[in-house]
């Protein structure tokens, strides 16, 4: 309470006198409260430090009790430039040889050099990436950069990136897949008029174009029925003098001779040319018979008995030459080779032949109204009708079945024409980088692949990251999967350090300095002694579930020093880690293992009902009571101050009245 000095004329400072009286009453009680609060807070802080160090040990032991605590793996590689690896706890320890046959890469195609001022469109690009596709509409007179922006900006673009490379000869369009692997191939088809520069952006492999021809051929076959090549009239088989068929070359010569003889015989009974042909045929027969009867040394150059086995196995007889028809047809026959030449060139109907068959049937149908067609053609030449109008008028004269037949023939012819144009007049893009999967040879026997350069679970629990291709003349990279002994070793070291930290902290908090007599905040506290006793009881106990050579902590080289801390004999520890790593879980794990016992002991100290928590709760309650004591003291002192001030004020007033009366009396006595 702030009160101004009153009655200074009487020489009294009431406020100062009241403050001194109140302080004399407050100080001893306030000092007791402050001392108690300091002691309580110091104890709470000390218990907090103990609990923290104990909980560190408890958490370490909780890690040891996890199922896969001792299943962590480490992976090392002999060539990190070729392959790296990561391993899960499921990985089996061992060493594996890795040959990287090829890295995964994305598909990339490029156009030919384009004119600087080229304009594209109108038309449409249909771009495929694997099984996904999207369309790009190209307006008339679009620039190359417009096409690039259209591709890259398409919302449904599954991962095709377009760019322009400025070659020394001019710009090129590059299309690249963002996704690697053989299943992410780029394809581009173009819908545009013939001669449109958009055709430069088409991309089809040779296989695609051949397949298109086959599909067109199949469409023709649907219209015409099973296609068969024109058959040559069968020639009578010619036998040698022993009744055996002649070799092919002799048979062919004899056939030719007979044909010549027959042609000549049609003109005169036996002409000189016929005689010559017959003679030539007989000579071919004789020559074939003679060759078939030759011994090996007579028909195989360089033959000897010593080399007979090799030469007989390896020597190839000269192959027959194809006739002119077969030579002309062979390039159009898929899968043609010399071995199958006779069969394929005779039986296979090419797309060109299918087109001829379609035209032949079409001509046969239209022949019925050939006269009308000539008249309509004349009107088309004069400009009176368009070709399409003439076609419709012409076919209207046919019966419905024939019209339908012609429409199907037209469709088949259109497919053949398109496929042939694509095959023969291809101007599109070329492949500059093949889309391929990564391939790895594991231990020289197992071949693995992935669409990217990460092969998951290449070995159970092991993922491989491929970085480079193995060199042919160098040994394969080797990866080693091992138990993570170093991690377990570090955890054991951390546990020992955590206990030593707890022990040193507890000693500092509960000790008494013999020189000064100063005590720690927990000096004489039984909680500290109880906590240490519990832990050391576990340290010295035996774990029944563990193997015989791992029954106690001392088997790991962990013992108690004279100072009370733990120390590690690293020779013993490393020996156990190297020789008995698979058995460590039996010592630390389980509900009765070492880790669980440590956890239980610490929980009995730091848990909700543990001794430290109980003491902390008690000290906190004492702090609450001190707060109440402080509030009560403050109320009492405030009341004391008011009462004392009132007394001094009343005294001052009484003194003033007495002085007034005394003055009046003195004046009266004069």
UniProtKB/Swiss-Prot annotation:
Residues 284-300 have a biased composition (Basic and acidic residues). Residues 342-428 form a coiled coil. Residues 226-300 are annotated as: Disordered. Keywords: Bacterial flagellum, Coiled coil, Secreted. GO terms for cellular component: bacterial-type flagellum filament cap; bacterial-type flagellum hook; extracellular region. It is found in: Secreted; Bacterial flagellum. Transmembrane segments: none annotated. The keyword Transit peptide does not apply. Disulfide bonds: none annotated. The keyword Coiled coil applies. One of its GO terms (biological process) is cell adhesion. InterPro entries: Flagellin_hook_IN_motif, FliD, FliD_C, FliD_N. Pfam families: Flagellin_IN, FliD_C, FliD_N. Residues 272-283 have a biased composition (Low complexity). It comes from the Bacteria. Required for the morphogenesis and for the elongation of the flagellar filament by facilitating polymerization of the flagellin monomers at the tip of growing filament. Forms a capping structure, which prevents flagellin subunits (transported through the central channel of the flagellum) from leaking out without polymerization at the distal end. Important for swimming motility. PANTHER family: FLAGELLAR CAP/ASSEMBLY PROTEIN FLID, FLAGELLAR HOOK-ASSOCIATED PROTEIN 2. V.parahaemolyticus possesses two flagellar systems: a single polar flagellum propels the bacterium in liquid (swimming), while multiple lateral (peritrichous) flagella move the bacterium over surfaces (swarming). The polar flagellum is synthesized constitutively but lateral flagella are produced only under conditions in which the polar flagellum is not functional. This is Polar flagellar hook-associated protein 2.
């Amino acid at each position: 309470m702030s009160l101004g000095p009153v009655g200074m004329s009487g020489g009294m400072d009431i406020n100062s006198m009241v403050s001194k009286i109140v302080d004399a009453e407050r100080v001893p009680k306030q000092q007791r409260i402050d001392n108690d609060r300091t002691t309580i807070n110091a104890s709470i802080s000390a218990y907090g430090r103990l609990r923290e160090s104990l909980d560190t040990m408890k958490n370490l032991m909780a890690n040891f009790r996890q199922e896969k605590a001792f299943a962590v793996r480490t992976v090392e590689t002999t060539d990190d430039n070729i392959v790296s690896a990561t391993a899960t706890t499921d990985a089996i320890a061992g060493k594996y040889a890795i040959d990287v046959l090829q890295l995964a890469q994305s598909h990339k195609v490029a156009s030919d050099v384009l004119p600087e001022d080229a304009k594209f469109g109108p038309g449409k690009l249909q771009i495929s990436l694997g099984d996904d596709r999207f369309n790009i509409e190209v307006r008339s007179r679009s620039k190359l950069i417009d096409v690039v922006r259209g591709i890259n900006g398409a919302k449904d673009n599954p991962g095709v990136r377009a760019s322009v490379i400025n070659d020394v000869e001019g710009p090129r369009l590059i299309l690249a897949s963002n996704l690697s692997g053989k299943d992410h191939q780029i394809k581009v088809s173009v819908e545009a008029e013939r001669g449109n520069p958009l055709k430069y952006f088409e991309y089809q492999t040779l296989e695609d174009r051949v397949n298109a021809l086959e599909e067109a051929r199949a469409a023709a076959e649907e219209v015409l029925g099973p296609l068969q090549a024109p058959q040559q009239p069968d020639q009578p088989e010619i036998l040698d003098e022993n009744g055996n068929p002649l070799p092919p070359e002799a048979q062919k010569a004899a056939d030719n001779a007979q044909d010549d003889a027959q042609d000549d015989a049609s003109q005169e009974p036996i002409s000189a040319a016929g005689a010559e042909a017959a003679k030539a045929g007989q000579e071919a027969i004789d020559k074939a018979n003679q060759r078939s009867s030759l011994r090996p040394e007579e028909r195989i150059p360089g033959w000897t008995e010593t080399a007979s086995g090799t030469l007989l196995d390896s020597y190839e007889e000269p192959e027959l030459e194809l006739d002119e028809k077969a030579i002309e047809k062979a390039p159009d026959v898929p899968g043609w080779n010399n071995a199958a030449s006779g069969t394929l060139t005779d039986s296979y109907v090419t797309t060109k032949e299918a087109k001829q068959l379609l035209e032949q049937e079409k001509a046969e149908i239209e022949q019925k109204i050939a006269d009308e067609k000539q008249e309509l053609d004349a009107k088309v030449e004069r400009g009176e009708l368009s070709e399409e109008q003439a076609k419709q008028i012409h076919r209207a004269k046919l019966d419905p079945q024939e019209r339908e037949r012609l429409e199907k023939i037209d469709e088949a012819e259109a497919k053949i024409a398109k496929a042939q144009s694509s095959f023969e007049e291809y101007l599109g893009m070329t492949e500059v980088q093949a889309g391929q999967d990564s391939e790895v040879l594991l231990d020289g026997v197992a071949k693995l692949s992935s669409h990217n350069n990460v092969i998951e679970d290449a070995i159970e629990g092991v993922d491989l990251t491929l970085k480079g291709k193995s060199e042919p003349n160098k040994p394969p990279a080797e990866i080693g999967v091992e138990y993570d002994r170093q991690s377990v070793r570090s955890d054991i070291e951390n546990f020992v350090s955590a206990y030593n930290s707890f022990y040193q902290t507890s000693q500092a908090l509960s000790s008494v300095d013999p020189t000064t007599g100063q005590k720690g905040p927990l000096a004489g506290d039984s909680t500290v002694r109880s906590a240490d006793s519990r832990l050391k009881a576990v340290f010295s106990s035996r774990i029944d579930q563990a193997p015989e050579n791992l029954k106690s902590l001392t088997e790991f080289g962990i013992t108690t020093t004279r100072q009370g801390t733990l120390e590690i004999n690293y020779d013993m520890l490393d020996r156990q880690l190297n020789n008995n790593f698979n058995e460590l879980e039996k010592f630390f794990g389980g509900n009765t293992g070492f880790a669980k016992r440590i956890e239980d002991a610490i929980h009995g100290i730091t848990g909700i009902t543990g001794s430290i928590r109980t003491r902390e709760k008690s000290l906190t309650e004492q702090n609450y009571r001190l707060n109440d004591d402080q509030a009560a003291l403050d109320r009492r002192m405030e009341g004391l101050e008011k009462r004392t001030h009132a007394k001094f004020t009343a005294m001052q007033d009484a003194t003033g009245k007495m002085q007034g009366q005394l003055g009046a009396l003195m004046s009266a006595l004069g």
